[in-house]
A protein has these predicted regions:
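Alpha-helical subdomain
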Residues: 164-168, 172-184
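A short, conserved alpha-helix within the catalytic core of class I
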Residues: 133-143, 157
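Conserved N-terminal segment of class I S-adenosyl-L-methionine
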Residues: 1-123, 127, 140, 156, ...
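C-terminal lobe and adjacent flexible extensions of AdoMet/dcAdoMet transferase-like proteins
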Residues: 209-210
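Short conserved AdoMet
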Residues: 76, 134, 148
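A short His-aromatic
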Residues: 128-132
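Residue-level detector of anion-binding/catalytic polar loops
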Residues: 102, 152, 196
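Conserved beta-strand signature within the Rossmann-like core of class I S-adenosyl-L-methionine
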Residues: 150-158
């Protein structure tokens, strides 16, 4: 077994909950669910369809602004961005477009057009998406490939730290959440790809491609 985040082999059992095994990578400190317990693609998609993310809902926009506000300060006016894993209600795309940015969007279930792979972007957002990655190493490499040098990747996910009771953690209980990251994980990801890394607030990380 190798870590799906960094491909390291220094893995140990972290916890066993409801007959599901969770492992921790001692290299990058990611925690991940045994792939034997992953949902089928159909079951996963059905869960996502249940999400009610109205792109004009002010509460949802307020939630997304936790990433929007810090990354928009890094950007030149009108540059092109990509929302990676935008889900069925791409509100963040709408927020950037309203501010004058040119946006593409990608989601493997709802917006599966992969033409973005032939382009490059000044910024990429990945909001409440990385915890769903079955193959995060490959996903982050794909993102890195289409991110311009000097460009920004903004990511939002719940960070794990050892003060959290993992068994009772609501974020773990979502059956579509299969990978959990700590601050240490993100610093490791950055060092492996020659990105700089800053954490402007809780559960938000900004990477710059050097």
């Amino acid at each position: 077994m190798t870590c799906p985040v960094c491909k390291g082999s220094n893995i140990e059992l972290f916890d066993q909950i409801d007959q599901k095994n969770y492992f921790e990578c001692n290299t990058c400190k990611a925690i991940f669910l045994d792939r034997k317990s992953h949902l089928t693609l159909q079951d996963e998609q059905e869960r996502y369809i249940q999400h009610n993310n109205d792109i004009y809902d002010p509460e949802y926009r307020r939630f997304l602004s936790r990433l929007y506000n810090p990354i928009v300060k890094k950007l030149s006016a009108g540059v092109m961005g990509l929302d990676y894993g935008c889900g069925p209600g791409p509100a963040l795309v709408q927020m950037f477009r309203e501010a004058g940015f040119v946006m593409d969007l990608y989601d493997p279930y709802f917006f599966p057009d992969t033409s973005f792979l032939s382009k490059t972007y000044k910024f990429i957002t990945c909001t409440e998406t990385a915890e769903h990655f079955y193959k995060p190493f490959e996903e982050f490499n794909k993102i890195n490939k289409v991110l311009d040098r000097g460009g920004w990747l903004g990511l939002m996910t719940k960070f794990f730290d050892k003060s959290i009771n993992f068994k009772d953690w609501y974020y773990r209980k979502d059956p579509t959440h299969v990978c959990f990251y700590s601050e240490e994980t993100f610093h490791f990801l950055a060092s492996e790809r020659n990105w700089s890394c800053e954490i402007p607030s809780k559960d938000i990380v900004l990477f710059k491609k050097n």
